[in-house]
Regions:
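Polytopic transmembrane helical bundles with strong interfacial aromatic enrichment
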Residues: 1-210
Length: 210
């Protein structure tokens, strides 16, 4: 195989994407499981659920942090590795990514900070609300990123003008059937992955303690 600059760029981008995407579904899935655990604690007042929540929260936060860092690297590589593509579709591709960064990511970051630093400082009901808002933020984040990805798979709402793609219908971007297919697939897969990962690690720990 001839390792020219394009092939090397593809290999680098593929490695970054694969590494990044391991943490994305894992953090989405574990986030929902942690939220369910804390909800059970609030409802049943059983300290076992609180211990479970705090234990898995550490793993969720680590996965979330690594996912954010690798995601930033991936976004930089769009400009560094595929600058021609970025110039061609930047007006369209950048819009959902900007919404994701300015709205969804800030929502996640704000409430994950409130959730992390307000144990025993706010009421349990308010505290569990924070983690559910984090989960809502991850859904929004995934949605807008998948809007950008769905345009790559099935371009809609654009026209070619002077050799560049220009947006003609912003609503068409996030109402495309492709977005629905990708979003349901990714979120369902993430929740399943999170549940299986937690169940698997818990099963290993139970076997070790026998």
């Amino acid at each position: 195989m001839d390792l020219d600059i394009v092939t090397l760029a593809r290999i680098q981008f593929a490695m970054t994407t694969i590494f990044h995407y391991f943490f994305v579904p894992f953090s989405i899935g574990t986030g929902f499981i942690v939220a369910i655990m804390e909800t059970m604690y609030v409802i049943k007042k059983d300290d076992l659920y609180l211990k479970m929540t705090k234990f898995w929260a550490n793993i969720f936060l680590l996965s979330f942090a690594v996912g954010v860092v690798t995601g930033l690297i991936q976004e930089f590589q769009f400009g560094m590795n595929w600058s021609d593509y970025s110039r061609f579709v930047g007006d369209i591709f950048g819009a959902p990514l900007a919404v994701e960064a300015l709205l969804a990511f800030f929502l996640e970051s704000t409430f994950i900070g409130l959730w992390l630093f307000t144990w025993d400082k706010v009421s349990p009901k308010l505290h569990v609300t924070f983690i559910w808002l984090v989960c809502f933020g991850t859904l929004m984040s995934a949605f807008w990123i998948l809007v950008a990805n769905s345009f790559m798979q099935h371009p809609v709402g654009y026209t070619i003008n002077n050799g560049r793609a220009e947006m003609t219908d912003f609503v068409a971007l996030f109402t495309s059937p492709q977005v629905f297919y990708e979003f349901t697939h990714v979120i369902a897969g993430a929740i399943i992955m999170g549940g299986i990962a937690i169940a698997g690690m818990a099963a290993i720990q139970l076997l070790r303690t026998k």
